[in-house]
Swiss-Prot record:
This is BTB/POZ domain-containing protein KCTD12. Residues 11-21 have a biased composition (Gly residues). The modification Phosphotyrosine is found at residue 119. Keywords: Acetylation, Cell membrane, Cell projection, Membrane, Phosphoprotein, Postsynaptic cell membrane, Synapse. One of its GO terms (molecular function) is G protein-coupled neurotransmitter receptor activity involved in regulation of postsynaptic membrane potential. GO terms for cellular component: cell projection; GABA-ergic synapse; postsynaptic membrane; presynaptic active zone membrane; presynaptic membrane; receptor complex. Residues 1-28, 129-204 are annotated as: Disordered.
Amino acid sequence: MALADSARGLPNGGGGGGGSGSSSSSAEPPLFPDIVELNVGGQVYVTRRCTVVSVPDSLLWRMFTQQQPQELARDSKGRFFLDRDGFFFRYILDYLRDLQLVLPDYFPERSRLQREAEYFELPELVRRLGAPQQPGPGPPPPHSRRGVHKEGSLGDELLPLGYAEPEPQEGASAGAPSPTLELASRSPSGGAAGPLLTPSQSLDGSRRSGYITIGYRGSYTIGRDAQADAKFRRVARITVCGKTSLAKEVFGDTLNESRDPDRPPERYTSRYYLKFNFLEQAFDKLSESGFHMVACSSTGTCAFASSTDQSEDKIWTSYTEYVFCRE
């Protein structure tokens, strides 16, 4: 009897096989941890498992309820990987928390977010994003330094500063031309105006304001060789500093994020650089996105040389930064 009693308490002992089997199955740990780390297109999100499975029959619900952890793709650090747009996933995750859709004012990429919602199989979110927008009766946005927002106009364009819409005069006929249209059709110099808006002149309300600084380290020629032999500009790498979301918006796939891959969209970084070495190409991309240069600086240094001749091109180096702003 003593042997049987001792055997009943052992994990592999006999006699109590039925009871031990049921207790061991109930004591098994869950397949997924309560805290889940997701790598969505290079952006890292940390949330609870109950949040990602809050919508039944969605893609995330099937991933974390119907599959085994070893069946899901992971990155080098063991986080579950999703090959989707990491910037838009923040709105997907925010919706999963309380099933409410909250978007910032002047959100221009509803169609892209709707496509992400379709991928994650969230039909209610897709329906809300596809519903027509009802403009609010609130006051027009405040004046900006580069222009005045004209509410209710086609495309929500910005009128140049000094061309604000005047108050309607009493007794004016309904068919009379608007003074604002007359002002907008003339340039400040009195000539015929070209296109009213370009990205480098004024910004629509959907664009985020901010600063981006690009810099490069190069070399230049000084001395007698500068006249005798032309030396072309040498740019080894163009660095990008600023808010992560702005840098990705401007440079897109030409931005190398390998030095700072897990930076959230609203954080700042100084470790990005471009995949090309042409300054003018970077300037074009910034101009197309509505940025304009507000400052620049450059420094030149001469490395130590054993000889007194400092006219060699490799001795002299420079570092230059350009600061761009969008309002």
